[in-house]
Amino acid sequence: MARGALDWIGAELVALDAKGLRRSLEPIGPAQGPVVRVGGRALVNLCSNDYLGLAADPRVRAAAADAAARFGAGSGAARLVAGDLPPHGALEARLAAWKGREAALLFGSGYHANAGVPGALVGRDDAVFSDVLNHASIVDGCLLSRAELVRYRHCDVEELAGLLARTRARRKLVVTDAIFSMDGDAAPLRELADLCDRHGAMLYVDEAHAAGVLGPGGAGLAEALGVQDRVDVHMGTLGKALGAFGAYVAGERRLVELLLSRARPFVFSTALPPPACAAALAALEVVATEPSRRTRLFALCARMQAGLARLGFDVARVASPIFPVVLGTEARALAAAAALRERGWFVRAIRPPTVPRGTSRLRVALSAAHDEAQVDGFLAALAEVLPGLPPEPRPPA
C-alpha cells in the first residue's frame, strides 16, 4: 500500500523521464562475458569492466566455489569482531606484494574505500585536491572528510601547483583516478608525485580501471610509470579486471594500521565474503602467469582506437580499454544505444550526472575475451547508426 509521504516521488520520476535521465536495470545472463543475453537476445557486450575476461573464468569460479565449501558463503561479521577469516589475510598479503607495498587492507567495494579513506587522513583543518573528473565516490569521500575540497581542472598540473602553493591547510591530500572511468585517459602520475614531494602533500591514486591492465606485472599505472614508491595510498578494486568483488588499499604498514581504526566503512561493515577473496586470489595468479591477456587486450584497443578516430571521435588521449564515444545530448546517446542494440551490440548510454551536461556518450569497454571481428563489427554498426541520430541542438544566436 502506497504511503502519502512518498507521493512527491511520482513527479520526480516524471521529471527524470522528461530529461532523459531516468535509469533502469537491465538483467543479463547467463554470466558475464563478451556475449550476453539481454531481453532474450544474444548481444556483444561492450559495456563491462571485465577487462581480462576473468569474471567467468573456470579457475576463478572454482576457487570461489571451493572457498564457499571451506569457509562459508559469508563472513558473518566485521573483520574487527569475528569476521577475519584466512582468505582475507592471504589476499591482503598477495595484494601488498603485487603493489610493492608493506601492507594492504580489504574494503567491501571501491565506493566504500573512496568514501572512507580520505576521512581517515584529513579533516576540518586540512585540504584535499581532487581532479574535476574523479569518480563520484572520490568526491563523496572528500566531502565526508570535512576537509576543504579544492577541485582542479582535469589533469592540469600547473593549476594544481598554484593551488598547493597558496593553501594554508595543515595537511594536504591530492586524489586522482589513475584511469578516468568515463574518458579512458591517464593521470599524469609522475608530475603529480613531483608536486606532492615539493609541497609535502599525500598522494592518493585510485587504480580501479588500471589494476590488472597496465604495467609489466599488471599492477596498474603507478607500476607502468615506475612511481609505486611515490604514491602514498594505492586504492584498487577486485571487481573489474580481476573479475571478483571488493576493493583494497595498499601502502605503508602504518597507513593500514590507521585505517583499521579510522576508516569507518571498514570498521562498520561485514567483511568481504570468503568466495570473493578466493576468486580474487585466483585472478591474481592468472594476471601473473598470463601476460598474453594484456597483450591481446591492447592489440584490440589499438584497433578500436584507430577505428573510432576514423569516424571522427576524439580518442587520442585514451590509454586504456575505455573509449568515450561522445555524442552530446542525452537523446543522441540514448538513440545510438537503442539503434546499436537492434544490430546486436550491447552498449549503454552514459548521461548526466555521471558525465557533464552536453557530453552524453556511449562508454565502449573492451575485454581480452573479445576478438577482432567483434571490434570491426561494432565500428561498422556505429558508422551505420551515426547519420540517423537526432541532430545536435543549434547554439543560441
Curated annotation (Swiss-Prot):
Pathway: Cofactor biosynthesis; biotin biosynthesis. Pyridoxal 5'-phosphate binds at G110, Y111, S181, H209, T237. InterPro entries: Aminotrans_II_pyridoxalP_BS (IPR001917), Aminotransferase_I/II_large (IPR004839), AON_synthase_class-II (IPR050087), AONS_Archaea/Proteobacteria (IPR004723), AONS_Proteobacteria (IPR022834), PyrdxlP-dep_Trfase (IPR015424), PyrdxlP-dep_Trfase_major (IPR015421), PyrdxlP-dep_Trfase_small (IPR015422). Substrate binds at R23, H135, T354. It catalyses: 6-carboxyhexanoyl-[ACP] + L-alanine + H(+) = (8S)-8-amino-7-oxononanoate + holo-[ACP] + CO2. Catalyzes the decarboxylative condensation of pimeloyl-[acyl-carrier protein] and L-alanine to produce 8-amino-7-oxononanoate (AON), [acyl-carrier protein], and carbon dioxide. It is an enzyme of class 2 (transferase). Homodimer. One of its GO terms (molecular function) is pyridoxal phosphate binding. It comes from Anaeromyxobacter dehalogenans (strain 2CP-C). This is 8-amino-7-oxononanoate synthase. GO terms for biological process: biotin biosynthetic process. Disulfide bonds: none annotated. Keywords: Biotin biosynthesis, Pyridoxal phosphate, Transferase. The modification N6-(pyridoxal phosphate)lysine is found at K240. Its cofactor is pyridoxal 5'-phosphate.
